[in-house]
From Swiss-Prot:
Few gyrases are as efficient as E.coli at forming negative supercoils. Not all organisms have 2 type II topoisomerases; in organisms with a single type II topoisomerase this enzyme also has to decatenate newly replicated chromosomes. Its EC number is 5.6.2.2. Heterotetramer, composed of two GyrA and two GyrB chains. In the heterotetramer, GyrA contains the active site tyrosine that forms a transient covalent intermediate with DNA, while GyrB binds cofactors and catalyzes ATP hydrolysis. It catalyses: ATP-dependent breakage, passage and rejoining of double-stranded DNA. HAMAP family: GyrA (MF_01897). This is DNA gyrase subunit A. It comes from the Bacteria. A motif (GyrA-box) lies at residues 560-566. InterPro entries: GyrA, GyrA/parC_rep, Gyrase/topoIV_suA_C, Topo_IIA-like_dom_sf, Topo_IIA_A/C_ab, Topo_IIA_A_a_sf, Topo_IIA_dom_A, Type_II_DNA_Topoisomerases. Residues 34-533 form the Topo IIA-type catalytic domain. Pfam families: DNA_gyraseA_C (PF03989), DNA_topoisoIV (PF00521). One of its GO terms (cellular component) is chromosome. Its main location: cytoplasm. It comes from Salmonella typhimurium (strain LT2 / SGSC1412 / ATCC 700720).
């Protein structure tokens, strides 16, 4: 007992568990659950097929008992339970499990209803014809062989398959910490994809999908939607929805409808499916079914679902799709062993690995065949030498007391070449000379020296080979060998020829075993890009002060003459008014900047479309805004271009410039666009090119204009720098990035405004007080905003009462900076203008002329006022 105790070594249980479990996990991953990307087989499948091949259980020979094969597999290669091996054989023989069966079974191998196969002592099997293509050239040293579990047998590490079996038959398995689930595909399509890859190794996933549109299941059915396929082929993971093929038939006399199911999804148990439908009918979870029966037979599947007279067959069928396995999801997870390591692979990765495997197999096969051809040519040379020297050789053999001495005598002396010289000359450059042949053998000094192998071949020569006809056959065979050797050397020396051989073999496989696609792939509404269904049109987007947002077509608003009463743009709640207004395209992205400096994304078409009088929807229901957070600026963006900046201005006069690409990745929770100080908020956002100028307009009628490059580009979370020096309670109301020669239109809260040429605003330094933009008087009120306009533009103005006026810019006077302007919109008492927006596409003049409108009396002739001393002083201050 003490001796035993001395053999016990204490170990840390954590380390032992970690080490042992890791060993177990890797054993399961590599040796059991995952297929090799090259041949698409797990170890148990590979061992079964190899055992059948060794047994000579070929497709064109008699069947053998399954028990015989199972015994060989578990006895030689797979030391596990017989049931696991037999289950593997059964699955490879089921037409509803494998797209291309690898085992040809005779007997009861189960059914799609879940019936078990008969015992292995009753069933018989042999290799399917296509299975031989997985093991073709196995005897030509094309793959490495490894020891079996006890070292008494050898088994191939991988099959030299000519078929891309991983994609063709798929695979599924659960390992430790990972799993694989690869759907089967159509052989013709997969090989076409491989050929396309051979032609262009830079082919894209989309290019491969032109040849391989999606999985092809043995049970056919319908794949509903392409998006999951595209995702799986691109990333290695995805989900597809498989729907049963069913049709609704109506009785011509009674009008009653019947649902006929001809195909069900892959891996669905038909009997359980029917039981589930019956259960749903019994529990009244599905209404409208009067009878259910299975009429499937040897000619095909047929599930009959009779619909009640008052029910609609399509409605019943849709309910069955949603509540039963008439529609299922298939999660694609393309994990396979690549160089012995588990790896998730996309479609191109799998095809690339298979083509590389074929390149290695064909190369090794060519080397093997070249060696064998040279060895045979070496023997033929000896036989030709024997025929050329027949008399002395026969005399030598007759005199030799033993075969060993005869062999030694043949090797010890040179022999005349005779007519063999021409034959050897045809070979040229020692192309047929074996690599192992020493220099002293073969042709030397005009004579031929035999090797031991050649001497033995001469001794084994039958007398009938001495006839003239046999001599001609020998020469013809040698000539054919020389041609074969030349071709083999060409394959080894030319990558193009090597790939051509691979292509030819794939085409032969396709032509021999290829068939039509079974599974139909249909478009799903989820696959259709919603933008493709939405027409592009210009719309008016409005955001009220209390956060109601909507859009409506721009054509809903008719142009009115200056001073018109306008039309209501929105029915607003009491004490609410339109706070933001812009014109955008339905396909644009709206960048929504909040009062807290955060940015949210929305497509214009995602906004609620509402009529002119409707309020819209609260934007808090569309965006994940926090408490007391509101949207203060919105900006339409078509594309996120390099070199374009987002320029932001706050009410306190702070400005910030950030690259537009910083905002190109939408996040559902939003991101920080600018850090704001307490009490500050965004008032304007625009896009700049890096060489633009910036204009900031304040409520007190001041404006500062400076170069954009005076503000460096900053990150998203930066606060910014001062753009304008404000006095007292003044605040910035508008940001303009002037472009072209358009004028600046300034509007005040009492409905007055004016146009002033942009070049009248001098360029100053950043962070100064600026110059006067418009006279702020009791009549005008403070400045509401400013926009840049052209003569052909129209503008839209909106009041806090919800009144909107659309006016042609050409009707507004162009005056100097230091003026009060003219009336643009008549407002009621206690009604103020709160926003304006330029409209770049005016309607026809005929429409404008047809609209009634009034012009404010005397306003049109208001002349520019002389600058006061205070104004001059303000300008001189800069």
């Amino acid at each position: 007992m003490s001796d035993l105790a001395r053999e016990i070594t204490p170990v840390n249980i954590e380390e032992e568990l970690k080490s042992s479990y890791l060993d177990y996990a890797m054993s399961v991953i590599v040796g059991r659950a995952l297929p090799d990307v090259r041949d698409g087989l797990k170890p148990v499948h590979r061992r079964v097929l190899y055992a059948m091949n060794v047994l000579g259980n070929d497709w064109n020979k008699a069947y053998k008992k399954s028990a015989r094969v199972v015994g060989d597999v578990i006895g030689k290669y797979h030391p596990h339970g017989d049931s696991a091996v037999y289950d593997t054989i059964v699955r490879m023989a089921q037409p509803f499990s494998l797209r291309y069966m690898l085992v040809d079974g005779q007997g009861n191998f189960g059914s799609i209803d879940g019936d078990s196969a008969a015992a292995m002592r009753y069933t018989e099997i042999r290799l399917a014809k296509i299975a031989h293509e997985l093991m073709a050239d196995l005897e030509k040293e094309t793959v490495d062989f490894v020891d079996n579990y006890d070292g008494t047998e050898k088994i191939p590490d991988v099959m030299p398959t000519k078929i891309p079996n991983l994609l063709v038959n798929g695979s599924s398995g659960i390992a430790v910490g990972m799993a694989t689930n690869i759907p089967p595909h159509n052989l013709t399509e997969v090989i076409n994809g491989c050929l396309a890859y051979i032609d262009n190794e830079d082919i894209s996933i989309e290019g491969l999908m032109e040849h391989i549109p999606g999985p092809d299941f043995p049970t056919a059915a319908i794949i509903n939607g392409r998006r999951g396929i595209e995702e799986a082929y691109r990333t290695g993971r995805g989900k597809v929805y498989i729907r049963a093929r069913a049709e609704v038939e109506a009785d011509a006399k009674t009008g009653r409808e019947t649902i006929i199911v001809h195909e069900i999804p892959y891996q669905v148990n038909k009997a359980r499916l029917i039981e589930k439908i019956a259960e749903l009918v019994k529990d009244k979870r599905v209404e409208g079914i009067s009878a259910l029966r299975d009429e499937s037979d040897k000619d095909g599947m047929r599930i009959v679902i009779e619909v009640k007279r008052d029910a609609v067959g399509e409605v019943v069928l849709n309910n069955l799709y949603s509540q039963t396995q008439l529609q299922v999801s298939f999660g694609i997870n393309m994990v396979a062993l690549h160089h012995g390591q588990p790896k998730i692979m996309n479609l191109k990765d799998i095809i690339s690995a298979f083509v590389r495997h074929r390149r290695e197999v064909v190369t090794r096969r060519t080397i093997f065949e070249l060696r064998k051809a040279r060895d045979r040519a070496h023997i033929l040379e000896a036989l030709a030498i024997a025929l050329a020297n027949i008399d002395p050789i026969i005399e030598l053999i007759r005199r030799a007391p033993t075969p060993a001495e005869a062999k030694a005598a043949l090797i010890s002396r040179p022999w005349d070449l005779g007519n063999v010289a021409a034959m050897l000359e045809r070979a040229g450059d020692d192309a047929a000379r074996p690599e192992w042949l020493e220099p002293e053998f073969g042709v030397r000094d005009g004579q031929y020296y035999l090797t031991e192998q050649q001497a033995q071949a001469i001794l084994d020569l039958r007398l009938q080979k001495l006839t003239g006809l046999e001599h001609e056959k020998l020469l013809d065979e040698y000539k054919e060998l020389l041609e074969q050797i030349a071709e083999l050397l060409h394959i080894l020396g030319s990558a193009d020829r090597l790939m051509e051989v691979i292509r030819e073999e794939m085409e032969l496989i396709r032509d021999q075993f290829g068939d039509e696609r079974r599974t139909e792939i249909t478009a799903n509404s989820a696959d259709i890009n919603i933008e493709d269904l939405i027409s592009q049109e210009d719309v008016v987007v409005t955001l009220s002060h209390q956060g109601y947002v909507k859009y409506q077509p721009l054509t809903d608003y008719e142009a009115q003459r200056r001073g018109g009463k306008g039309k209501s743009a929105a029915r607003i709640k009491e004490e609410d008014f339109i706070d933001r207004l812009l014109v955008a395209n339905t396909h644009d992205t709206i960048l929504c900047f909040s009062s807290r400096g955060r940015l949210y994304w929305m497509k214009v078409y995602q906004l609620p479309e509402a009529s002119r009088g409707a309020r819209g929807r609260p934007i808090v229901n569309l965006l994940p805004l926090e408490a007391n957070e509101r949207i203060t600026a919105i900006l339409p963006v078509r594309e996120y271009e390099e070199g374009v900046n987002v320029f932001m201005a706050t009410a306190s006069g702070t400005v910030k410039k950030t690259a537009l690409t910083e905002f190109s990745r939408p996040r559902s929770a939003g991101i920080i666009a600018v850090n704001l100080n307490d009490g500050d908020e965004l008032i304007g956002v625009d896009l700049t090119s890096g060489s633009d100028e910036v204009m900031l307009f304040s409520a007190a009628g001041k404006v500062v204009r400076f170069k954009e490059d005076a503000v460096r580009a900053m990150g998203r979370t930066a606060t910014g720098v001062r753009g304008i020096k404000l006095a007292g309670d003044d605040k910035v109301v508008s940001l303009i990035i002037p472009r072209g020669e358009g004028a600046i239109l300034t509007v005040t809260q009492n409905g007055y405004g004016k146009r002033t040429a942009a070049d009248e605003y001098p360029t100053k330094s950043r962070a100064t007080q600026g110059v006067i933009s418009i006279k702020v008087t009791e009549r005008n009120g403070s400045v509401v905003g400013a926009v840049q306009v052209d003569d052909c533009d129209q503008i839209m103005m909106i009041t806090d009462a919800g009144t909107l006026v659309r006016t042609r810019v050409s009707e507004i006077s162009v005056v100097g900076r230091n003026t009060q302007g003219v009336i643009l919109i008549r407002t009621a008492e206690d009604e103020n203008v709160v926003g304006l927006q330029r409209v770049a596409e005016p309607v026809d003049d005929e429409e404008l002329d047809a609209i009634d409108g009034s012009v404010a009396e005397g306003d049109e002739d208001i002349a520019p006022e002389a600058e006061s001393d205070d104004d001059v002083a303000d300008d001189a201050d800069e």
